[in-house]
């Protein structure tokens, strides 16, 4: 395991612990900006696991990718904020037009989105993939089946272009959620465990 230390909080975070799958080599992922979000220059997909506070930086990175070309966003946790992306793109319509967004509100819809996503040379970003899989009204075994089916489509899509998948911990940790994360992490080419910088406390004012 390698530890990446970022000098400032304008990246995803101050530190990212990286786990690499022994098979497969990620030839060129560039940090955008100086965090653990990357642009794929070769086939593969990476997993970003961390707090929800990292989402705004991921959206900024999506805007950066849009500056270079088309990018597909699949939103599993209603995390895509068009205003944040537009601000990061400085309101340039040509950048925003290159970003396509699809949303899923159940784990079944997430699988359906991935099934319908064509295998083309356009990088993809899946936001908060496990959000809908935390739904306890769906049996754990069924959630695992759906997740493995989603992974098969991520692997299909990575053959044409790289991608990034983000996940956040559930509000209430539980064994089923951890098992789902383990399944996803085992399938990813690389995993970055993101820790956001904690702002320094303001000094106490006596007067």
Language model segments and positions:
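Anion (oxyanion) recognition and catalysis
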Residues: 65-66, 155-159
């Amino acid at each position: 395991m390698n530890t990446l230390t970022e000098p400032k909080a304008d990246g995803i975070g101050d530190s990212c612990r990286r786990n690499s799958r022994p098979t497969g080599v990620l030839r060129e992922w560039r940090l955008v900006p100086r965090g653990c979000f990357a642009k794929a220059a070769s086939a593969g997909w990476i997993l970003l696991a961390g707090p929800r506070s990292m989402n705004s930086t991921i959206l900024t990175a999506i805007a950066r990718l849009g500056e270079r070309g088309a990018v597909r966003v699949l939103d599993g946790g209603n995390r895509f904020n068009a205003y944040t992306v537009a601000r990061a793109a400085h309101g340039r319509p040509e950048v925003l037009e290159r970003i396509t967004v699809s949303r899923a509100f159940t784990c079944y819809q997430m699988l359906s989105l991935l099934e319908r996503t064509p295998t083309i040379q356009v990088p993809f970003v899946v936001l908060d993939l496990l959000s809908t899989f935390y739904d306890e009204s769906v049996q754990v075994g069924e959630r695992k089946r759906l997740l493995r089916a989603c992974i098969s489509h991520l692997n299909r899509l990575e053959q044409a272009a790289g991608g990034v998948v983000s996940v956040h911990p559930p509000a209430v940790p539980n064994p089923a959620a951890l098992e789902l994360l383990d399944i996803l992490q085992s399938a990813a080419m690389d995993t970055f465990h993101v820790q956001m910088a904690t702002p320094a406390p303001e000094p106490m004012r006596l007067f």
